[in-house]
Amino acid sequence: MDLVMLLVLTLTCLILLSIWRQSSGRGKLPPGPIPLPIIGNIFQLNVKNITQSLTSFSKVYGPVFTLYFGTKPTVILHGYEAVKEALIDHGEEFAERGSFPVAEKINKDLGIVFSHGNRWKEIRRFTLTTLRNLGMGKRNIEDRVQEEARCLVEELRKTNGSPCDPTFILGCAPCNVICSIIFQNRFDYKDQDFLNLMEKLNENMKILSSPWTQFCSFFPVLIDYCPGSHTTLAKNVYHIRNYLLKKIKEHQESLDVTNPRDFIDYYLIKWKQENHNPHSEFTLENLSITVTDLFGAGTETTSTTLRYALLLLLKCPEVTAKVQEEIDRVVGKHRSPCMQDRSRMPYTDAHDHEVQRFIDLIPTNLPHAVTCDIKFRNYLIPKGTTIITSLSSVLHDSKEFPDPEIFDPGHFLDGNGKFKKSDYFMPFSAGKRMCAGEGLARMELFLFLTTILQNFKLKSVLHPKDIDTTPVFNGFASLPPFYELCFIPL
């Protein structure tokens, strides 16, 4: 009995100590629900729909509030004003990468997505400069995307108008574009290496968006001591990285420093230039992780958006008809669509923006962190605190986008039918950590979709009213449900 009493007393003291430590720090941090000892607010969150949970909390605590994932505080920013104030008005202070334990374990603070501090700044600056040198935003890259769009059309013709799952084919096109940028060549859609890479990328997107991965983010100790899909994620990343390491080795053997061919060549030249510097960030290991980041980010986000776009076109045949009418009128049948067409196609442009707004691909963004102690809206946020910015709350703001849960390209059209920009359009995030490939992704979305609709009528195997567009995952990413469709040649 004495032992039981001692255990109860000890546990009570630990709980009181935990509550005191958290409440003493909460005087400086924004308000939020009272966390439980050790586990924090985890049981107050719906890990299958974190966005919904954050919206509920914001109604109680306002647009800036604190949640505890385990024993660590995380500040949540909800709504356009709070997100803009942090990421744009205080961009430098909110530019650090926040905690993402599953990725940190794999990337080891290297690459462009999950690195920190000066290392991240140097690699990002180099990446943006190199992408510009390779023609990003210029005709060179546009030519590559147009060529891949033509290959995509030929591959879709091979389906002979039969029902098919578009996942793999729609993944191949953006993947080939990023491959041409990284190591200068594309794959045939039947190439076995390509099939394997695409399978790994697709599986990883599902794993990252699963409740288990969200749970591992709250309790990182699970990554080391519990089996789970995070081990499959790591194996898939290492498989992709090993393939890219072979490409790097081939480039080392054929490198001509006077004539760089692609991203790997530019990096190897920089690596050689800094070989004398023992503190250089430009190591071969960092190269392998950076190109893996580019490979994954440049493929899955665009392919998922394309897949969702076709599903929404099937669901809304009246929208499809308007887009196809505009394509017929502006582009016609005898040439490929080009980026110059977009300014004369306001409805199609509005449609592409509405797809990205509506699907809300990365609902809570990648986590940020503050680079220093900062006073934000009369709260003191300590250096290193993880920041979650709810992009959903911006993209689905009912004041900016009336009836935000309805898919309507009119959200981006003015009263005269002209395209209307919105500061609330943040699918690529904002500020210092904004997606480096935004321009490429928007180009691919426009050219791939217009080329598909120029050449095919989309036919659903279900009646439009029976098509479900609800995402099957809503964690890291919102992924569309499985569906099939027919590509009927025009």
Curated annotation (Swiss-Prot):
Pfam family, one: p450
Membrane topology: Peripheral membrane protein
PROSITE patterns xref list: CYTOCHROME_P450 (PS00086)
SUPFAM superfamilies reported in the protein's UniProt record: Cytochrome P450
EC code: 1.14.14.1
Compartment annotation: Endoplasmic reticulum membrane; Microsome membrane
GO terms (BP aspect): arachidonate metabolic process; long-chain fatty acid metabolic process; monoterpenoid metabolic process; organic acid metabolic process; response to nutrient levels; response to xenobiotic stimulus; steroid metabolic process; xenobiotic catabolic process
Membrane listed as a keyword: yes
GO molecular function: arachidonate 14,15-epoxygenase activity; enzyme binding; heme binding; iron ion binding; long-chain fatty acid omega-1 hydroxylase activity; monooxygenase activity; oxidoreductase activity; oxidoreductase activity, acting on paired donors, with incorporation or reduction of molecular oxygen, reduced flavin or flavoprotein as one donor, and incorporation of one atom of oxygen
Cellular component terms per the entry's GO annotation: cytoplasm; endoplasmic reticulum membrane; intracellular membrane-bounded organelle
Cofactor dependence: heme
Top-level EC class as recorded in UniProt: oxidoreductase
Designated name of the protein: Cytochrome P450 2C6
Organism the protein comes from: Rattus norvegicus (Rat)
Species lineage: Eukaryota, Metazoa, Chordata, Craniata, Vertebrata
Encoding gene (name): Cyp2c6
